[in-house]
A protein has these predicted regions:
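N-terminal pre-Walker A segment at the start of P-loop NTPase domains
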Residues: 2-36
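Glycine-rich phosphate-binding loop of nucleotide-binding enzymes
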Residues: 22-123, 128
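P-loop NTPase motor domains
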Residues: 71-77, 85, 89-94, 121-293
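Short strand-loop junctions, especially beta-strand C-caps/beta-turns
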Residues: 17, 35, 50, 277-279
Length: 293
């Protein structure tokens, strides 16, 4: 009571304190006002710690799981949805599976702590995974083929791709880190987004690259954009799109999807995990920007 831990409004568990009364150890659950995490007062949460130990990631996942538990309570009027980005290895690609323990005593100890904190010992619920499309039919991921197939059979894994007809207007995100002092790249991107010239009606990336190449030819006249600018644009685009299986038509097989289509139908208490761990830095930025936009 002296710490005010019993007076927190909209409480969500964020950890516990161990204190001693003489020789007796007392464990006190610590709760914070959930509005400062996910409500109208929400802001960034800073978690500090030693790099390489996965401690910061583990605590972030603990806190997010506590939030989902709170929103799943029968009398809760709150709901929340999560979008995670898996950026290293396969750390976040099995969060719907029970945790593994080295021995039974560790399991009992950890589960006991969760119970004292008023949390369930169940993994995340309503989890959906998205992997970069690959010609290998498994996805460009660190996840094993067996694990991916199990997720696919369970109906919670899809391969994401970018379709020319629908995603041609998103190419500006590939130039986020490209210096463009004269805004010539912006001019080209707007030219394409407005389907000017021969960009109208394109539905295939190979045709798109061919039209870009045509604009790079010497003597090609464009009142607004120079050939040199088109050549710079072409270099960046070809490095990202050419022979990249992520850029292609979406097959009508319920296994391939556009991230935009999946995320705009996100439902309450769902968890969507987007794997970008094996993508290069530019493509990671592109996928992240697409999801956030």
């Amino acid at each position: 009571e002296a710490l005010g831990l019993n007076k927190v409004k909209n409480p969500v568990t964020c950890g516990y304190l161990e204190m001693y009364n003489n020789k007796d150890k007392i464990t006190l659950p610590v709760k914070m006002d959930s509005r400062f995490l996910i409500g109208p007062e929400g802001a960034h949460l800073n978690i500090s710690g030693i790099s390489g130990l996965a401690a910061k990631t583990s605590y972030a996942m603990f806190l997010l799981k506590a939030i989902q538990d709170k929103c799943y309570e029968a009398d809760s009027e709150d709901d929340v949805a999560f979008v995670f980005f898996n950026v290293k290895g396969k750390d976040l690609l099995a969060i719907d599976q029970p945790a593994e323990f080295d021995n039974e005593s560790d399991k009992e100890r950890v589960y006991g702590q969760y119970t004292k904190l008023g949390l369930t010992t169940l993994p995340f619920k309503n989890v959906h995974y998205y992997y970069p499309y690959s010609a290998k039919k498994v996805g460009n991921t660190y996840l094993s083929k067996e694990a991916y197939n199990e997720q696919r059979i369970n109906g919670n894994a899809k391969l994401y791709k970018y379709d020319c007809e629908d995603d041609m207007k998103k190419l500006d995100m590939l130039f986020a880190s490209i210096e463009d002092p004269n805004q010539t790249m912006d001019s080209i991107i707007n030219y394409i987004a407005n389907e000017q010239g021969n960009f109208r009606g394109l539905d295939d990336w190979a045709d798109f690259l061919e039209v870009v190449k045509e604009n790079c030819q010497a003597g090609k006249k464009n009142d607004e954009i120079s050939v040199g600018s088109w050549r710079k644009f072409n270099r960046v685009i070809r490095n990202s799109i050419y022979n990249n299986p992520m850029f292609g038509r979406i097959a009508d097989d319920n296994e391939q999807t556009r991230l935009e289509d999946s995320l705009k139908h996100i439902k309450k208490n769902e968890v969507h995990v987007i794997d970008i761990a094996k993508l290069n830095e530019d493509m990671q930025g592109f996928v992240f920007g697409d999801a956030i936009r």
